[in-house]
Amino acid sequence: MNKKAMAAAVSMILAGGAHAAQQERPNVIVIIADDMGYSDISPFGGEIPTPNLQAMAEQGMRMSQYYTSPMSAPARSMLLTGNSNQQAGMGGMWWYDSTIGKEGYELRLTDRVTTMAERFKDAGYNTLMAGKWHLGFVPGATPKERGFNHAFAFMGGGTSHFNDAIPLGTVEAFHTYYTRDGERVSLPDDFYSSEAYARQMNSWIKATPKEQPVFAWLAFTAPHDPLQAPDEWIKRFKGQYEQGYAEVYRQRIARLKALGIIHDDTPLPHLELDKEWEALTPEQQKYTAKVMQVYAAMIANMDAQIGTLMETLKQTGRDKNTLLVFLTDNGANPAQGFYYESTPEFWKQFDNSYDNVGRKGSFVSYGPHWANVSNAPYANYHKTTSAQGGINTDFMISGPGITRHGKIDASTMAVYDVAPTLYEFAGIDPNKSLAKKPVLPMIGVSFKRYLTGEVQEPPRGNYGVELHHQAAWVDGEWKLRRLVPRGLTAGDAPWQLFNLHDDPLETHDVAAEHPDRVKAMSEAYEAFAKRTMVTKAQGKMIDYVGIDSKTGRYLAVDPATMKPVPAPQAIPVSEIH
């Protein structure tokens, strides 16, 4: 099926969903992109052709002020549970002296919370998962143990997209593996991540009895680095980015204005993209353009796989009653590669020559300048930060009851609102006890009645998030943020204040002009932090490189020296709850 025909099929599926019988339980599909920038896809101003996502946007709603976490695993934990990342157990991507051994920092899903998979399974849904997990790889935290009937899971945070499954770096190696229904599996020669995840999901949906509803979690690893795509997809974008950073950025800004996401009088961040491009030699420009070409190919390929999913829904008669959510975990990744705490020897295995960029055996990242383009209108601050560019990401929803087709809504919505929203659409009681002991109540609120137009006032007025002492508190048009530089010891920084109505791109800190507001908002944030189990990051950074099979303890190391941290400071798996 060609792209136009596929997009037309998607449009028919999504339009039909709006007319499904309300008493029939909807299928629910959550699709996640990994490290994707705010304006990469066409529904949010991107030049990369994404016809299937565009059709979804036109038949559903876009939330332009959707807030998430600065990084992947914490965001996924909030999404899957409706709780804060600390409540879920993912208070960090690593530890500090002050957080290791503390509740909220187990670095895996705990039984303090209930997952969407567990609740949908209890309600009779066939619960399916394909793609990135990143929520724990110790007993009790795997997809099968957290509610999925079937799961084809990449367990770690990132890997190469072909069948060689090379880890992101030295310390990532121990959780770089795939499982199918809990058993480790090898990958076929023709494996490419996005295609394999969609193919497996399509197969499971087709095998599900027609009378049984489906809850599907399709978590692409695209476009997370290393940037890789099949040759035929890379060729489609040949020459497209040789105009350089600034021109692509300007075109995206113009489209964002046309969509109404920003306005003509919106203050823009200071960038020198023309200067940065002109500082490159012609050979460097050609190489850098090729890297972005690969990135675009990854997103276009992902969209095509979403199209195959839509076709499967049509073939199985589920097209008129499927609630579809698309989002990304965090902002664009500005890293330039050769990081992830790896040894120099690790990087010697890659062939990053021009001809091999994007192919198996290469490892490239697009760096801060393309990240500024990818994340437009946000710039300078991206993934890992509490700036808008780190936590304000794409969100779309379509299906039964979503009637405001094509609308872009600027109401504040939180990542932990997704679970309660989907529960209400499916008629699931989120307070029903599924465990032997009580779990924490969700902090998210349902947007169901707002999304269907039953009420006109959005249910959320504020949003809080914390990760590694990066913090943000959004209250209406005001935002308080703390930007902490990343290093081998925990940092600190004063609060900054921004008026998102006048300055949505955070170009002018007005904290000094509004001390009373800073005080009130910081007190509100501290109350949120206390309620959601936040422990302030202090002291040295501590990473983990595996699990000791003899003692059942995490193998914790000092990343500055890669020497083990004394065993008493590590967390016994048996004590994690």
Swiss-Prot record:
Subcellular location: Periplasm
Catalytic activity: an aryl sulfate + H2O = a phenol + sulfate + H(+)
Cofactor stoichiometry and binding remark: Binds 1 Ca(2+) ion per subunit.
InterPro entries: Alkaline_phosphatase_core_sf (IPR017850), Sulfatase (IPR050738), Sulfatase_CS (IPR024607), Sulfatase_N (IPR000917)
Enzyme Commission number(s) from the entry: 3.1.6.1
Cellular component GO terms, alphabetical: periplasmic space
Positions of Ca(2+) binding: D34, D35, S72, D329, N330
Signal peptide span: 1-20
Keywords of this entry: Calcium, Hydrolase, Metal-binding, Periplasm, Signal
Pfam entry (one): Sulfatase
Residue list for modification 3-oxoalanine (Ser): S72
Active site: S72 (nucleophile), H134
Cofactors demanded by this protein: Ca(2+)
Post-translational modification: The conversion to 3-oxoalanine (also known as C-formylglycine, FGly), of a serine or cysteine residue in prokaryotes and of a cysteine residue in eukaryotes, is critical for catalytic activity.
PROSITE patterns: SULFATASE_1, SULFATASE_2
A GO MF label: arylsulfatase activity
Family: Belongs to the sulfatase family.
Protein's job: Plays an important role in the mineralization of sulfates.
Name under which the protein is recorded: Arylsulfatase
Organism: Klebsiella pneumoniae
Taxonomic lineage from the root: Bacteria, Pseudomonadati, Pseudomonadota, Gammaproteobacteria, Enterobacterales
Encoding gene (name): atsA
